[in-house]
Amino acid sequence: MDLSAKDEFSAEKRNPDNYDSVNNPSGDWRVDSYPSENLISAGPASCSPSQMMDSFGQTLWYDPTSVQAVGYAGFNGGNASSSSFRGSIDRSLEMGWNLPNLLPPKGNGLFLPNASSFLPPSMAQFPADSGFIERAARFSLFSGGNFSDMVNQPLGNSEAIGLFLQGGGTMQGQCQSNELNVGEPHNDVSVAVKESTVRSSEQAKPNVPGSGNVSEDTQSSGGNGQKGRETSSNTKKRKRNGQKNSEAAQSHRSQQSEEEPDNNGDEKRNDEQSPNSPGKKSNSGKQQGKQSSDPPKDGYIHVRARRGQATNSHSLAERVRREKISERMKFLQDLVPGCNKVTGKAVMLDEIINYVQSLQRQVEFLSMKLATVNPQMDFNLEGLLAKDALQLRAGSSSTTPFPPNMSMAYPPLPHGFMQQTLSSIGRTITSPLSPMNGGFKRQETNGWEGDLQNVIHINYGAGDVTPDPQAAATASLPAANMKVEP
């Protein structure tokens, strides 16, 4: 493609009126069969995908009413229609197509309409063949999306147009390299188109390695030598990158495959070296179970040890108290007869309790005996003596310490006898106590002897009998100074 065509295409891109005229054609245009004498070739232009796909049929656009009065996409269709047709034909010849090859046999497929308004600049002219359309759809030219979505877009899908552009470039190069002659039939053109579509479909798969394999001859023959070299270099770089990635992946897989048998071999060796193992699998399972159970056990022991240390550090007073208790228990064992033969603290305490209860019974029995032998020890003698003394001083000699209404079992004693007996009892009680061994008997005998002597003295005084002086002397002595005869 020459520079003039590029300039025209850029100017059309800048001018939005061209798009409006293409997308909104006038109402006078209609689709009908067009005479074969006025065939025109496709040139550099821009069109919507819907219009471009409609051009693949057996009909073309033309103005039946007035070709001279109607213009399309900035090209006037008046008296200069022949000149515009001629310019489009010359342009197609410059792009690599031969005019005789563009003319199909009568009654067969027709060509696209005026190139100034339908096709992009890099699209080449190719016949409207139904087989070509089917092959294009088969080779995923429209696989990027739905066909209806692509047609309904205002300027077409960019990916689909790019595929068409690539197909156009390859078709131009193929046609120029093959240099089709005028005398060749129309089937050769269709074969060339088939080859170009196959190559364009191969270029449309960038992810597959080796998809960018396009010969430099076909790209350079299309008139874009520099661009073809750049694309070929890019494809070579992609090839190299893809090969490097594939090699790296293969090496990584091989390393993994090598490491897996090594690990398996190490496990087998460990199983063989371990003793006391009836089976490799069972031993490995047991070892794993032991390893999994050991860490929590260690932690548990560690925690218990810490707790024991804490209790030991804070229980010194408790230990001292327990030691004292054990010492006292030993002392009780020594006191209780027969307790040394017993083993165990509980049994020893039972023996001590039984011994103490027996001692209590003995004490009660002895106290009962003492009460029967000396019953006067329970009275409050001092209170009684004080009351008697007051009554004796206040009353006359005829009065008695007992009331007159009280019946007396015995006759009243004389006044002197009562006073003397009370005084003697007071002396015996206030006398100092002797030691326990035989002291109680001596005190009792001293009291009774003093009473007897007083009774004898009183009897002699009442009968006016002069007693023996020795007896009087002995009677006047206190009871404490008397000697006890054996």
Swiss-Prot record:
UniProt biased composition (Low complexity): 273-293
Annotated organism of origin: Arabidopsis thaliana (Mouse-ear cress)
Biased composition (Basic and acidic residues): 1-17
SUPFAM superfamilies referenced in this protein's UniProt entry, alphabetically: HLH, helix-loop-helix DNA-binding domain
GO process annotations (BP): regulation of DNA-templated transcription
Note: Plants over-expressing BHLH49 show increased hypocotyl and cotyledon lengths and increased flower size.
Protein name: Transcription factor bHLH49
Region entry Disordered, spans: 1-30, 194-300
Biological role stated in the UniProt entry: Transcriptional activator involved in cell elongation. Regulates the expression of a subset of genes involved in cell expansion by binding to the G-box motif.
Quaternary assembly: Homodimer. Interacts with IBH1.
InterPro entries per record: bHLH_dom, bHLH_ZIP_TF, HLH_DNA-bd_sf
Keyword Glycosyltransferase carried by entry: no
PANTHER family: STEROL REGULATORY ELEMENT-BINDING PROTEIN, TRANSCRIPTION FACTOR BHLH49
Keyword set, alphabetical order: DNA-binding, Growth regulation, Nucleus, Transcription, Transcription regulation
Molecular-function annotations in GO: DNA-binding transcription factor activity; protein dimerization activity; transcription cis-regulatory region binding
